[in-house]
Amino acid sequence: MSIYLDNGATSYPKAPGVGEAMLDYVNNVGANVNRSTYATASTAAMILLDTREQLCRLFNFDDPTHVIFTPGMTAGLNMLLKGYLKAGDHVIVSSMEHNAMMRPLIQLEKEGVEFSRIPADRDGIARAEDILPLIRPNTKLVAVMHASNVCGSLLPVKEIGAICRERNIPFILDAAQTAGHYPIDFKELGLSALCAPGHKGLLGPQGIGVMLMDHEFAKSVEPLIAGGTGSASDSEELPPYMPDRFESGTMNIPGVYGLNAALTYILEKGVDHFRAHEEKLTQRFLDGLKDIPVRLAGTEDMAKRVGVIAVDFTGHDNAEAAFALEQMGILTRCGLHCAPSAHKTLGTFPQGVVRFSLGYASTEADVDGALEAIRSIAR
């Protein structure tokens, strides 16, 4: 019997009904959307529309036509960053970012785009006011993650959004570790765009992601991918209207069906339900670590974190610790988590950490089992 504590990588198990919904599409529907008008094609199109509307409800977003399906979180960020930024532009990120943000920016840097990082402290906590000295006349974008995939620390995105609004700077949110886990209000945060994967806190399958863009920002983003949309087929130009402009090619419809089932479950339960559950388990985990000779990388303040817990087995090799945990049935992720800048900020580079990430299906028994295993390795 294993204990799955790698929900920061992907959720498991998926929400009830996800597999069945995907199988229903494959076995009983099978049609593409925007290509034909027969019954099964219309059925699939209605599921896509319903899923866009579900995402509007989840994130308090107004327009389902500006909800874009992507292959995943990384694809969404690439579409936004590479479609918006140009040579001479400056963008502000944080020192906690994942490589899904940083690698596109490193590529763009070679083309004349500059970036600065909001510094976080050794607990992964950043202050919104530290963005102010970084703003330049050519600052065209602020793009940050909502919560660290390494240590779970939350960035002060509401305050950052307010600063961006005051200065008319577009603001992009990477919600990879918070969508489905933590309440997100597109309007309240003053977002220009939001990206999220379908397979983490949204409890859907891999291979499907979402990108929400407000009307003004969408007009400034050039599509990264061009091709067939099933619409405006008399022209070799991309259609000017949404969502078609950003959805060239064949849609991952099985993925959307799975995501639709997952969102139905999340909306029925409410995000606050999942947040409360993970807060309770995270606090239990943090309390249990206090008498074990390991280092917690990240804050103990539950108001400033999510259920991603980074443990440094000081005096031990973290990779060996992760292997020992696996032998005891505790499934985690060890290493640098595609976020070297975050580890440098936390003081855990290059050794990395062992990451325990909780999910909706995690239990107190899972937490206690993990703590017992950590204790046996660390002593």
Predicted regions located by residue number:
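Pyridoxal 5′-phosphate
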Residues: 1-379
